[in-house]
Amino acid sequence: MKGKLLKGVLSLGVGLGALYSGTSAQAEASTNQNDTLKVMTHNVYMLSTNLYPNWGQTERADLFGAADYIKNQDVVILNEVFDNSASDRLLGNLKKEYPNQTAVLGRSSGSEWDKTLGNYSSSTPEDGGVAIVSKWPIAEKIQYVFAKGCGPDNLSNKGFVYTKIKKNDRFVHVIGTHLQAEDSMCGKTSPASVRTNQLKEIQDFIKNKNIPNNEYVLIGGDMNVNKINAENNNDSEYASMFKTLNASVPSYTGHTATWDATTNSIAKYNFPDSLAEYLDYIIASKDHANPSYIENKVLQPKSPQWTVTSWFKNIRIMITLIIIQVEATISMK
């Protein structure tokens, strides 16, 4: 997967009695904060410094932790928190704002999890790089490692993190994931087919969890499924993703991509000729409390610029952080 950071806005109209179908701004103005859940998904591109020592993982952990955009959410899904030291630093920086946190997916299978499911292995070289942080108590934490990946993804415990979060007297279920990357090293195995099977594993988990149908289930993170040029194609992988999860298709605003080499210097350095892609989402299960309005809004805050040295060359870094801040306006009454 190509590194990026994503923020979106999602507004969920309320369940049985009071569905709201206006704009997201109107929805936000019309509801009390106690009746609102705001969720963000954020790919921080913290690859291991053992392999990539010069991408400012520690510096970015401090920038992310201090940034205004990451504040005042209810829940934040973090992707690619692979580097142990940098991810520990980031989670520590977020602790004051988000005191309730999961461990990083696949890093261990200890008591920090209520359950470890799927294909977890302590001998896999890399963890799954997903964590969830919350302002509100997390009543249950489950990590699930996918059955299969291809290419370099086979060397990581990729999967998803499930959290049961209690805001006031209402439970909301948030799943954060990072699906199979598009990779030529997969050989004859189709990365898209691997992603489809991973989505089926998520859906099977949700069904087997027997979550009450009057509670919201949100699935978010780096899906590695490109929306661009696929929205009007019912046979596309993009359309298939929503069918497999039986999830609502959100509306989209803000920047038109969640990974864009024209706005992110690390992406440009690694993939200078690659086209922009829209790969990150937060969506809601239609098998449970179904929002009347969902919007994914992509914003682009910029980091300060700094210079690193790699192979005796100075590289100037200025990252435009592409973020999906998803605000879920739901009834908590």
UniProtKB/Swiss-Prot annotation:
The cysteines joined by S-S bonds are 150-186
List the Gene Ontology MF annotations in alphabetical order. Answer: sphingomyelin phosphodiesterase activity
Q: Which SUPFAM superfamilies match?
A: DNase I-like
An example GO BP is: killing of cells of another organism
**Which leading EC class covers this enzyme?**
hydrolase
Q: Where in the cell is it found?
A: Secreted
User: What does the activity regulation annotation say?
Assistant: Activated by cobalt and manganese ions.
The record's InterPro entries line, in alphabetical order, gives: Endo/exonu/phosph_ase_sf, Endo/exonuclease/phosphatase, Sph/SMPD2-like, Sphingomyelinase/PLipase_C
- Quickly give the catalysed reaction: a sphingomyelin + H2O = phosphocholine + an N-acylsphing-4-enine + H(+)
The protein's predominant localisation is secreted
> Which EC number(s) does UniProt give?
3.1.4.12
Q: Where is the signal peptide?
A: 1-26
Entry comment on modification after translation: The N-terminus is blocked.
Q: What keywords were assigned to this record?
A: Cytolysis, Disulfide bond, Hemolysis, Hydrolase, Secreted, Signal
Provide GO CC annotations from the record: extracellular region
Which coenzyme or cofactor does it need?
Mg(2+)
What is known about what this protein does?
Required, with sphingomyelinase, to effect target cell lysis (hemolysis).
The family assignment reads: Belongs to the neutral sphingomyelinase family.
Entry protein name: Sphingomyelinase C
According to its UniProt entry, this protein's organism is: Bacillus cereus
